[in-house]
């Protein structure tokens, strides 16, 4: 066979293979259309697959048609009912670790936000950690100067509890340098305070969209709880302050339903000071333990009824729980008046257990270091010093910070009572350490039916970071 014949033979063979390939494709398509199951059947040609992603909670409908995927995002249907939250608190013999985010340790080499004021709140299906970012990342030049409380860069964001406040899993909630958030059983409600000190605005978000606003009424740094608000049978309550941090200010409690404000009440508290309340539901009412930044080393107590009537006073216990504070032995306690004559303070919490009270406080009397919870017999109703339980959460060799309360709803636990939980913020960086930044991580503890051994679940990050040495 000469070269020309070889070329003709190879070409003819190739052409024949191409034609055969085309015929096979035609047969394949014909079989797919005519033979495989059609509408109403579970064939692989035309099917719908529902996928749920828990991190950024979205639902996808994926329609597969001839190897082509059509993705349609579906709005997540809301729950069918509001949470009740009228149950009593469960009795807690101790507090077990629920989560720890280790955000600063991870942030030395990860994309983690610079934050402060973390807090936890729960829906019927999950708990989330909320936090106020500084619009910057750890170990980055924009972290410089983040000791400042209020800036236009601060935002409220959230992650599933236990996750670090990282850029990949965080969900935007609101523009805010002060905030609160809670779930009514159907949707999340968040309140973010932002704007200039004299004309700040609180924007209410429900289901992720703005639904109402509260303008500053006293013109002096409108601010709110920095912890979970409280929803009872679809109505959500939170406390706000407007006015000086070191003398008489103005205080209001607000009530909203599905993101719309339906009531508010002025809290009359002459001679007392209320800031950064830590609130929780208990037997159909909202109980709050707050911060007196003016004079008291005992904590204000505010009990709110669904009709916005209230009782206000101070935590009766004969042990102080604010910082700075004096010696326990020199403190007498009062149910009605500030005691201790110490200015400044730190956000804290307490839980009523019948007439007893669990109260959290720093171990140090003068600085935000260490953290312990004490149970005081009759401490909710009397000036009792009888400490019946004590548990260390952070030892006094390590920094702590704010702390606050929340509860696990019965829909989540399947119990007939609300589990009391608290979180402890562990502040690192300025002003106590030689860095250019200030941020924090947190540990979360929940009430259990057993005593828990003392330990230190401290932050553990090794400072300074690379950015601090440039």
Regions found by a protein language model. Give the residues of each.
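Alpha-helical transmembrane segments in eukaryotic/viral proteins
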Residues: 8-40
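C-terminal structured domain segments
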Residues: 405-411
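Beta-rich carbohydrate-recognition and catalytic domains
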Residues: 43-113, 117-276, 280-346, 350-401, ...
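Short, low-complexity, Lys/Arg-enriched N-terminal segments of secretory-pathway carbohydrate enzymes
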Residues: 1-3
């Amino acid at each position: 066979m000469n070269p020309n014949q070889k070329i003709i033979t190879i070409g003819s063979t190739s052409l024949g293979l191409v034609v055969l390939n085309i015929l096979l494709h035609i047969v394949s398509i014909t079989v797919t259309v005519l033979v495989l199951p059609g509408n109403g059947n579970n064939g692989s040609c035309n099917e719908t697959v529902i996928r749920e992603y828990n991190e950024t909670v979205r639902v996808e409908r994926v329609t597969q048609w001839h190897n082509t995927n059509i993705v349609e995002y579906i709005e997540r249907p809301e729950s069918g009912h509001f949470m009740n939250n009228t149950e009593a608190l469960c009795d807690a013999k101790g507090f077990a670790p629920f989560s720890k985010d280790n955000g600063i340790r991870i942030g030395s080499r990860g994309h983690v936000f610079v934050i402060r004021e973390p807090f936890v709140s729960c829906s019927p299906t999950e708990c989330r950690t909320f936090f106020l970012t500084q619009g910057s990342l750890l170990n980055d030049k924009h972290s410089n100067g983040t000791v400042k409380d209020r800036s236009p860069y601060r935002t409220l964001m959230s992650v599933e509890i236990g996750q670090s406040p990282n850029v990949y899993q965080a969900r935007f909630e609101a523009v805010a340098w002060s905030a609160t958030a809670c779930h009514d059983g159907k949707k999340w409600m968040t309140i973010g305070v932002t704007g200039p000190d004299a004309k700040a605005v609180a924007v209410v978000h429900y289901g992720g969209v703005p639904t109402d606003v509260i303008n500053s009424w006293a013109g002096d740094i409108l601010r709110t709880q920095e912890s979970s608000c409280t929803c009872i049978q679809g109505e959500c309550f939170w406390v706000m302050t407007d006015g000086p941090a070191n003398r008489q200010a103005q205080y209001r409690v607000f009530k909203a339903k599905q993101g719309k404000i339906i009531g508010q009440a002025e809290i009359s508290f002459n001679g007392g000071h209320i800031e950064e309340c830590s609130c929780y539901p208990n037997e159909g009412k909202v109980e709050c333990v707050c911060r007196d930044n003016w004079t008291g080393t005992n904590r204000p107590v505010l009990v709110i009824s669904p009709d916005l009537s209230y009782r206000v006073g101070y935590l009766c216990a004969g042990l102080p729980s604010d910082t700075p504070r004096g010696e326990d032995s020199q403190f007498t306690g009062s149910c009605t008046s500030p005691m201790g004559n110490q200015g400044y303070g730190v956000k804290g919490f307490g839980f009523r257990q019948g007439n007893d009270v669990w109260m959290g406080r720093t171990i140090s009397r003068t600085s935000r270091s260490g953290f312990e919870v004490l149970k005081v017999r009759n401490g909710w109703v009397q000036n009792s010093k009888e400490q019946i339980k004590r548990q260390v959460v952070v030892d006094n060799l390590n920094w702590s910070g704010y702390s606050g309360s929340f509860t696990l709803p019965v829909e989540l636990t399947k119990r007939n009572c609300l589990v009391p939980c608290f979180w402890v913020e562990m502040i690192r960086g300025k002003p106590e350490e030689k860095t250019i930044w200030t941020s924090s991580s947190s540990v979360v503890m929940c009430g259990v039916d057993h005593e828990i051994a003392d330990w230190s679940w401290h932050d553990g990050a090794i400072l300074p970071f690379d950015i601090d040495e440039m």
